[in-house]
């Protein structure tokens, strides 16, 4: 059973190209250079980042960086992925892009756990959500249950919250 944590903080190598960021991870696996090249091409295509292949990590926008981090994490072929604040520090178009990637990963059967304070963006894509207060689970349920809960509104969402 393999899992991958993608932290909120940038985790790509800033002075390496996107391609070399992917290769750095693939070199930890027992793959030939030809197999690495094929996997890199596949990941670049799958996550729509072929056009930034030769750009340095420090030159990427927040959304591009997030897509590269996800692709890099999936190079290890995990069964489960933990996303910490995936919507932090990215523009609205990138949010929609990351939501699409998460939905795609769900369709592939990958287990996904998201921790995020951007509740609206998160509730739009999850099957189940948990609201915590003081380290305890206050409420759990599907997105509609959470969004319509008086308890969630009182302690976290606010009275005017709408999905």
Indicate where each model-derived feature is located.
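Short coil-to-helix segment of the ABC ATPase nucleotide-binding domain corresponding to the Q-loop/switch region
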Residues: 15-23
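Conserved ABC ATPase "signature" region
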Residues: 23, 34-52, 100-103, 151
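Conserved ABC ATPase signature
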Residues: 56-60, 64
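Hydrophobic anchor residue at the start of the ABC signature
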Residues: 70
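Conserved catalytic motifs of ABC-family nucleotide-binding domains
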Residues: 77
